[in-house]
Amino acid sequence: MQNQKIRIRLKAFDYRLIDQSAAEIVDTAKRTGAVVKGPVPLPTRIERFDILRSPHVNKTSRDQLEIRTHLRLMDIVDPTEKTVDALMKLDLPAGVDVEIKLQ
């Protein structure tokens, strides 16, 4: 797998889970002899919603809710076969979405 790189993009609502998962991936890749660039924190996407408090009247009384989506990006340069096998066997928390691309 010479001159290849693996790009990993992590997405989660909880920043602690995503940082823990990124640290596990970095440790696994370094243990197998690959070079890791990152994790790079990408901008947090914030979705805001306005919801009426009352079911009948009081249009001016509203609750504001938000969902924050945290993103991390990392590249594994010159991965070995051990690196790919170790990454496939890695057990990450359920709240973390992982996208892996080979380039």
UniProtKB/Swiss-Prot annotation:
GO terms for molecular function: structural constituent of ribosome; tRNA binding. Keywords: Ribonucleoprotein, Ribosomal protein. GO terms for biological process: translation. One of its GO terms (cellular component) is ribonucleoprotein complex. PROSITE patterns: RIBOSOMAL_S10 (PS00361). Gene3D superfamilies: Ribosomal protein S10 domain. The keyword Membrane does not apply. SUPFAM superfamilies: Ribosomal protein S10. PANTHER family: 30S RIBOSOMAL PROTEIN S10 FAMILY MEMBER. Involved in the binding of tRNA to the ribosomes. Belongs to the universal ribosomal protein uS10 family. Part of the 30S ribosomal subunit. This is Small ribosomal subunit protein uS10. The gene is rpsJ.
